[in-house]
Amino acid sequence: AFESAWRLSRIHDRHELHELLREDPELCLERRSAPERLFFSLRMQAFARNAIGSLHEAMESIAIDSCTFRSPEIVLILGESYNKHHAALYGYPLPTTPRLSQEEAAGRLYPFTDVVSPANFTVQAFASQDRQTAWCDTPLFPALFRRAGYDTLMFDNQTTFTLENDDVWDQEIRHFLYHPRLSPQLFTHCNADKYPFDEGLLADFDRQDLRFRNPHRLTIFHLMGQHVAYRNRFPAEAGYFTADSIPEYSTSGLRRSRDERRIVADYDNAVRYND
């Protein structure tokens, strides 16, 4: 217990913190006692303040010489908890991605098949073997588009812009991405509401569409996607699979109970709804 606090106390900057968490990713899980939790929180708040300051400086330093706007309308969709092994697009036997598969067949979609990530956790996935730079030392990409003359529209279903929501990931996203010092550098518009299902973002987009006359736009949709609990990620009428749709034995030969197959069916329904 006290070893964790001592190790954290020896860290002087976020680079050392990243190295420590890379070496010992379970470190933060060891803070069981109230004093440990308080100490950890205070240290993390200090590092967060430094990270926000670094991000602000990095984005202030952006210089765009010119932009041809060869792609005037760009849409980026960020999914969540998406496992390609449950996507028919990548060979899954159930029809979880009928629309994506149709787009691929028509030659309008290119599925990547050889992508390697250093981690399955968002921030750690930014790590680069060739460039030992902390993620907060370089500009976030929406700021580049904004500085180049694009309107940057953000429709996010993982956070709200009020203080009533106490979800941990909601607070983390709001603390960095929508920090009052950083958000104006990143986005022309952010949605104000959160929706039970991701299609609510599309209705929100339709309501806002006429407000922005700039022909050059980057629109980002950040979905709740297939985040747990899976049964909450699709409306009842969108249910397509049931426990009976899922094989009793997994591809690795493990027998699945009916409850386990129902959970898999819920996930597959979330994938299909996401599609």
Describe the residue ranges of each PLM region.
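Active-site-proximal alpha/beta segments of enzymes that process anionic O-linked groups
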Residues: 5-251
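Conserved small/aromatic sequence motifs within transmembrane helices
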Residues: 243-266
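Metal-dependent active-site segment of extracytoplasmic phospho-/sulfohydrolases and closely related
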Residues: 75, 269-275
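Surface-exposed cleft-lining segments at the edges of enzyme active sites
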Residues: 186-194, 258-271
